[in-house]
Curated annotation (Swiss-Prot):
It comes from the Bacteria. InterPro entries: AAA+_ATPase, ATP-synt_VA_C, ATP_synth_F1_bsu, ATPase_a/bsu_AS, ATPase_alpha/beta_chains, ATPase_F1/V1/A1_a/bsu_N, ATPase_F1/V1/A1_a/bsu_N_sf, ATPase_F1/V1/A1_a/bsu_nucl-bd. Produces ATP from ADP in the presence of a proton gradient across the membrane. The catalytic sites are hosted primarily by the beta subunits. F-type ATPases have 2 components, CF(1) - the catalytic core - and CF(0) - the membrane proton channel. CF(1) has five subunits: alpha(3), beta(3), gamma(1), delta(1), epsilon(1). CF(0) has three main subunits: a(1), b(2) and c(9-12). The alpha and beta chains form an alternating ring which encloses part of the gamma chain. CF(1) is attached to CF(0) by a central stalk formed by the gamma and epsilon chains, while a peripheral stalk is formed by the delta and b chains. It is found in: Cell inner membrane. The gene is atpD. GO terms for molecular function: ATP binding; ATP hydrolysis activity; proton-transporting ATP synthase activity, rotational mechanism. This is ATP synthase subunit beta. It comes from Sulfurimonas denitrificans (strain ATCC 33889 / DSM 1251) (Thiomicrospira denitrificans (strain ATCC 33889 / DSM 1251)). Pfam families: ATP-synt_ab, ATP-synt_ab_N, ATP-synt_VA_C.
């Protein structure tokens, strides 16, 4: 190690640390390591260069708590950005922002190491074809389909099933596509991260997923950069292995929030609502790397927390510009016992177009939405006057809409433990066939209950015969 790559800490302000170098100037985003002896244990603290202050002094952001740092301590420049392990060895493991495993297992030492700061694929490398990504979940595939290499926003409050949908998607991608997933917990509750790990272990999907956690309790640097750590692992599988990878970010709002904290600590002038002036650029730099190339794709599902339910807040607004589809979870649907509690009228997708999906899929999806909307409009009349006052046509619409509502429910593989009914993966062709039959009136003779918590329409027909 060159002597002049060793600097001295000159100032510590919480997570912001200034380091003086003589003769060597670390570049922006370069990692600097400090060895701290805290209460008899040696720990490695990584700092990331955020600004040059002049005269060989750099301002850095700490990737962990800065307790134990003192002025005059040695800090060693590494000559490169933070590097994390990638490849097969990361599957089934939990990592922190600097690529160390935090799951009590052995550290990953013999895997390729990639920098977390990377350029997005060149324009000529990117794939321009729009292709649907089949999830095996009826309501998603029919009404708000995901695109390969696209970005999906998962909106929902606490306890409506965001995590269960994420786990089911990981399971179905592993089963239906032989694909891999990467989960980045950005500013997550530590308890939720722990629950997710154990639930994945119990559902046998852990060996197909890499987990990266930067919890709420960590400094803003770790919460911000953890999204890049997870994305780098996903990029390896896309670029080197040619796979279709699913990338989960929970929660993308915390990425913007931690960026705003870092910006304030670095002394930048805040922008609207106190956010960092570079919010759109930071969000764009992350989202730009999530894309399809001619080799493989990264499809991302991002949980979006909306502060105070204000969709015009700059953080969620900066995410919307990048999304191809939105899956909205609704508490009222969950209260009816219909899971997944996806709102069929609020969820949307830019793929819902006859030129992309074909006429049949498009017409069935629109027919389902029209029937459900008409039922919603008739509910006030039903509440006041009862069903008897409706015309025959309206009665048919109400009955079909109730069957559609029930048929949008589906038993999940990862929820078998709670529901006791085996999970179902429903192919797109079966999904379209089932809803087409309900809309055309072929299922008018079947009882409503036969559509609840089944896979395809054939299963509902079998159930109806048993109920007679």
């Amino acid at each position: 190690m060159e002597k002049n790559m060793i600097g001295k800490i000159s100032q510590v302000m919480g997570p912001v640390v200034d380091v003086d170098f003589d003769g060597y100037l670390p570049i922006i985003n370069e990692a600097i390591e400090v060895n701290i002896n805290l209460e008899g244990t040696q720990t490695r603290l990584v700092l990331e260069v955020a600004a040059h202050l002049g005269d060989g002094r750099v301002r850095t952001i700490a990737m962990d708590m800065s307790e134990g740092l003192v002025r005059g301590m040695n800090a060693t420049a590494t000559g490169s950005p933070i590097k994390v392990p990638v490849g097969e060895k990361v599957l089934g493991r939990i990592f922190n922002v600097i690529g160390e495993t935090i799951d009590d297992g052995e550290q990953v030492t013999d895997a390729p190491m990639w920098s977390i700061h990377r350029q997005p694929p060149a324009l000529v490398e990117q794939s321009t074809t729009t292709e649907m990504f089949e999830t095996g979940i009826k309501v998603v595939d029919l009404l708000a389909p995901y695109s390969k290499g696209g970005k999906v926003g998962l909106f929902g409050g606490a306890g409506v099933g965001k995590t269960v949908i994420i786990m089911e998607l990981i399971h179905n991608v592993a089963m239906g596509h032989d694909g891999l997933s990467v989960f980045a917990g950005v500013g997550e509750r530590t308890r939720e991260g722990n629950d997710l790990y154990h639930e994945m272990k119990d559902s046998n999907v852990l060996d197909k997923v890499a987990l990266c956690y930067g919890q709420m309790s960590e400094p803003p640097g770790a919460r911000n950069r953890i999204a890049l750590t997870g994305l780098t692992m996903a990029e390896y599988f896309r670029d080197e292995k040619g796979l279709d990878v699913l990338m989960f970010v929970d929660n993308i709002f915390r990425f913007a929030q931690s960026g705003s904290e870092m910006s304030a600590l670095l002394g930048r002038i805040p922008s609207a609502v106190g956010y960092q002036p570079t919010l759109a650029r930071e969000m764009g730099a992350l989202q730009d790397r999530i894309t399809s190339t001619k080799n493989g794709s990264i499809t991302s599902v991002q949980a979006v927390y909306v502060p105070a339910d204000d969709l015009t807040d700059p953080a969620p607004a900066s995410v919307f510009a990048h999304l191809d589809a939105t899956t909205v979870l609704n508490r009222k649907i969950a209260e009816k016992g219909i899971y997944p509690a996806v709102d069929p009228l609020d969820s949307s997708s830019r793929l819902l177009d006859p030129q992309i999906l074909g006429e049949e899929h498009y017409n069935v999806a629109r027919g389902v939405q029209q029937t459900l909307q008409k039922y919603k409009d008739l509910q006030d009349i039903i509440a006041i006057l009862g069903m008897d006052e409706l015309s025959e046509d309206d009665k048919n619409i109400v009955e079909r809409a109730r069957k559609i509502e029930k048929f949008l429910s589906q038993p999940f593989f990862v929820a078998e433990v709670f529901t006791g009914s085996p999970g179902k993966y429903v192919s797109l062709a079966d999904t379209i066939k089932g809803f087409k039959m309900i809309l055309s009136g072929e299922c008018d003779h079947m009882p409503e209950g036969s559509f609840y918590m089944v896979g395809g329409i054939d299963e509902a027909i079998e159930k109806a015969q048993k109920m007679k």
